[in-house]
């Protein structure tokens, strides 16, 4: 018998920890048999998952490529350098840092590099579609800085750039944040640049939700207009869960590098960075542009059909992957609607809408996104059918027969558009 036989590190997960293996396979089954409409979620490729589940998880590599504090980094250096080059090529940036563990970490590093506690920042109100890290009082960004929040116009539910300009002129922020978590319309980055220049502010674009659309050229890019751009690497970009910082200025780049390490993080996650590199490579392919165009077309189809069925959509439609329902039009809360669609295997999230009278735990909205199901192959016609299932369920919450029909239609759609190639064979995938 060899010395290697029977070692704990050689056991498969199913042998080593059957409980965790079972939970993973249950989650795999849930993803296969439910319609994923959470706007911040997507399905990573098998290649991305293989990179993330590799031996790279064993390697510590504090510092930057060729400037590490540990030995044995020659291979992770090559991987990280490739991830950086692909990110720069994908977004037309002069510099990239691929080490942030998340979008929130990327934003925090930018704040650390450019701001001092007590400085004034401007960001979109969370209830109007902003993000926690853009100055919400429950987040460190809202505790360390003087926050001025702008909102959308009450009638159009779109950004009013002149109102934002007047607010900036009044408060003279040191940094303005644009880019959002629940704003379904195109962002005018050039207009934000003009405002930032007028008041002498830095301009940060958080494109976490639209990064894939930007990469594919189906949404305007913030990179030419902003001092710094942050993003996650999942969502519409379809990579692993992680963060990324981009900029055009070499002096800023040095500050951001130091703000990531040693300023706010220790060792980078090289297995995740490898998965980011794979995802960036996928996004550089022509097929990714076609995918992103379909994401936007599918969102338009979903919004149009829901409106046709009598449900209001915030701003009257969408220009990106997000469709935000205003359920006040049907006398329902987001909390109730979320439970109703979840009960027929549609996964979404309750969400505040502009000028929402309900609390964030109840809300008047339901947020959908089309990136994940588009990855499964759903087209516009399939999304119209999804809209009908949603409407049937919301308008008939007590009808068991309609509930069952909704479940049947969801099941049929999942069979028609399997998640991974082996989904129909029910093979467990632990990568």
Curated annotation (Swiss-Prot):
GO biological process: glycine biosynthetic process from serine; tetrahydrofolate interconversion
Keyword Flavoprotein carried by entry: no
Enzyme Commission (EC) number: 2.1.2.1
Function, in words: Catalyzes the reversible interconversion of serine and glycine with tetrahydrofolate (THF) serving as the one-carbon carrier. This reaction serves as the major source of one-carbon groups required for the biosynthesis of purines, thymidylate, methionine, and other important biomolecules. Also exhibits THF-independent aldolase activity toward beta-hydroxyamino acids, producing glycine and aldehydes, via a retro-aldol mechanism.
Keyword terms: Amino-acid biosynthesis, Cytoplasm, One-carbon metabolism, Pyridoxal phosphate, Transferase
Binding locations of (6S)-5,6,7,8-tetrahydrofolate: 126, 130-132, 359-361
Classification via Pfam families: SHMT
Cofactor(s) this protein requires: pyridoxal 5'-phosphate
Principal location listed in the UniProt entry: cytoplasm
UniProt record similarity statement: Belongs to the SHMT family.
Quaternary context: Homodimer.
Annotated positions for site Plays an important role in substrate specificity: 234
Annotated compartments: Cytoplasm
One of the record's GO cellular component terms: cytosol
S-S bonds: none
The protein's name in its UniProt record: Serine hydroxymethyltransferase
């Amino acid at each position: 018998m060899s010395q290697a036989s029977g070692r704990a590190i050689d056991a498969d997960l199913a042998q080593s920890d059957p409980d965790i293996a079972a939970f993973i396979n249950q989650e795999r089954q849930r993803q296969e048999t439910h319609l994923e409409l959470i706007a911040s979620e997507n399905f990573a490729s098998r290649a991305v998952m293989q990179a993330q589940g590799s031996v790279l998880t064993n390697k510590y590599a504090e510092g930057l490529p060729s400037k590490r504090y540990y030995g044995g980094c020659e291979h992770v250096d090559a991987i990280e350098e490739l991830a950086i080059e692909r990110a720069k090529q994908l977004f037309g940036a002069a510099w990239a840092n691929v080490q942030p563990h998340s979008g929130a970490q990327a934003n925090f590093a930018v704040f650390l590099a450019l701001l001092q506690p007590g400085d004034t920042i401007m960001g979109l109100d969370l209830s109007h579609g902003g993000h926690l890290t853009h100055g919400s009082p429950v987040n460190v960004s809202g505790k360390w800085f003087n926050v001025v929040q702008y909102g959308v116009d009450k009638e159009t539910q779109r950004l009013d750039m002149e109102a934002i300009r007047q607010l900036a002129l009044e408060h003279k922020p040191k940094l303005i944040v644009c880019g959002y978590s629940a704003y379904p319309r195109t962002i005018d980055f050039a207009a934000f640049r003009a405002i930032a220049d007028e008041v002498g502010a830095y301009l940060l674009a958080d494109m976490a939700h639209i990064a894939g659309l930007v990469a594919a050229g189906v949404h305007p890019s913030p990179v030419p207009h902003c001092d710094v751009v942050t993003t996650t690497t999942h969502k519409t970009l379809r990579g692993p869960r992680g963060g990324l910082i981009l900029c055009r200025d070499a002096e800023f780049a040095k500050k951001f590098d130091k703000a990531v390490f040693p300023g706010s993080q220790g060792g980078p996650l090289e297995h995740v960075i490898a998965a980011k590199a794979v995802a960036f490579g996928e996004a550089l392919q022509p097929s990714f542009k076609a995918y992103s165009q379909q994401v936007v077309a599918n969102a338009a189809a979903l919004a149009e059909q829901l409106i046709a069925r009598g449900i209001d959509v915030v701003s009257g439609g969408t220009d990106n992957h997000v469709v935000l329902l205003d359920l006040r039009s049907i006398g329902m809360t987001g909390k109730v609607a979320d439970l109703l669609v979840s009960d027929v295997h549609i996964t979404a999230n309750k969400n505040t809408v502009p000028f929402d009278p309900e609390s964030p735990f109840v809300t008047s909205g339901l947020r959908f996104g089309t990136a994940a199901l588009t990855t499964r192959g759903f087209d516009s016609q399939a999304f119209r059918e999804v809209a009908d299932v949603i409407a049937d369920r919301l308008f008939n919450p007590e009808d068991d027969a309609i509930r069952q029909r909704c479940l049947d239609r969801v099941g049929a759609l999942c069979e028609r558009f399997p998640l991974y190639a082996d989904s129909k064979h029910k093979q467990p995938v632990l990568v």
